[in-house]
From Swiss-Prot:
The lineage of its organism: Eukaryota, Fungi, Dikarya, Ascomycota, Saccharomycotina. Belongs to the triosephosphate isomerase family. One of its GO terms (cellular component) is cytosol. Homodimer. This is Triosephosphate isomerase.
Amino acid sequence: MARQFFVGGNFKMNGTRESVSKIVDGLNKAELPSNVEVVIAPPAPYIALAVNENKQKTIEVSAQNCFDKASGAYTGEISPEQIKDLGATWTLTGHSERRTIIKESDDFIASKTKFALDQGLSVILCIGETLEERKANVTLDVCARQLDAVARVVSDWSKIVVAYEPVWAIGTGLAATPEDAQETHKAIREHLSKSIGADAAEKTRILYGGSVNGKNAPEFKDKADVDGFLVGGASLKPEFVDIIKSRL
């Protein structure tokens, strides 16, 4: 089946009011394809700015993280309700930097994913293996474990987009070959068909998220199970538009 092409832009902990406004303005001025879904994730202080200044109907705004409680004594956290109150409609969960630096567990990420969905947000669920895990040839075991944690608590995956990000390729300039990505994405979809059902797995978009840029994005064009990209550093640059247009 044809799944709508999806491009996510994760700004990470980068930007100021001025630079985020400039990025959004650049997207507003671009002629973007109407059949590509785009989601940008600025730092939390600039979510409302991005929402208010975005003029593109095909672009929505996401948080980079959320908590699994509605409110309370959770210093520094942000709830789905607060994210929605700022006008955003998405959140990321499970980004490798949260897993490796902040030490978030599979179960905690699953809990956050479920709570975000229950509160009406859509979710970009990030999964992927480290370089050590790749060398140990356990890529699919790791991805399956991370997905299964969510599948145990979430039955409806219609508002989840999965992003496969090989941790060894993030911010390193190293990228999996399109063939590598397709092979892994196909295996992820096959695993999902067992855990959430064949129909849901077929409909779930799986993004590639490892050092994607304007130059290498078109190389993934004919890969059947690569349904888009989760872009990091390149989303801060004009080439983000080239990535959005890479399926034209």
